[in-house]
Amino acid sequence: MKRMIAALALVLTLALPGLAAAEGTGMYLAPKFLMSIQDTGRMERSSGLAGSGVDDYSQFTLGGALALGYDFWPQQMLPLRAEIEFALRGNSEHSWSDGGTNVSDVKGTWNNSTLFANLFWDFHNDTPFTPYIGAGLGLAFNYTGYDFTTTNGSKFSVDDRFTNFAWNVGVGASYSFNENLAIDASYRFVGLGYNEVSAYHNGQKYEVGNDPYNNEFMLGLRFAF
């Protein structure tokens, strides 16, 4: 993640002078800083995890996104923007030690990245501030993993990766410094599909399913070119 952010900063530093001098074509590049509250959503457990305490969990994580977009306002005077966005987020982790019937400790690790096609409606006015609403459809690339410790001390793990349909809806506002540069702040809700992993240990089935989602706050820039 640190390498990605450093590389992105270098690219933007090199590209900024050219972007600032470019004429408005409607195209823009938008790096975004993500503050994400990742939630496991509803947790479904098999009987092997009875009493383990495994339940809904949420955690604040950081991430980053990069979007390439087109603003229909400069050329067509339509208050629409469309963009393709890829976002990465940090891991969410939690441990339960409630001493269940079969397991004494469970550690969960979750992660998601997304690829969205987003559409925004801008409410243009006579000020540099432009409120907007938006929604997007795309794919979520989810990771789910669990480490189990049984009541007799043995350990085993299960994990998997999922590619799910994902969606988002949100609101935000931008402030334009000039025709080529704007700062953007927004909130969105992100649905990430359904994940389910299972394993057998000593003849007992251990299965966990969940519907993850994120509440995300984003701060970004838009470089028009």
Regions found by a protein language model. Name each.
Residues Q38-L62, L88-T114, L139-N164, L192-F217:
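Extracellular/periplasm-exposed beta-strand and loop segments of Gram-negative cell-envelope proteins
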Residues M1-G26:
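Cleavable N-terminal export/targeting peptides
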Residues T25, A30-K32, Y57-S58, L62-D71, ...:
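Outer-membrane beta-barrel transmembrane strands
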Residues Y28, L34, P212-F225:
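Outer-membrane beta-barrel "beta-signal"
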Residues L66-L68, A82, A117-L119, I133, ...:
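Membrane-embedded beta-strands of outer-membrane beta-barrel proteins
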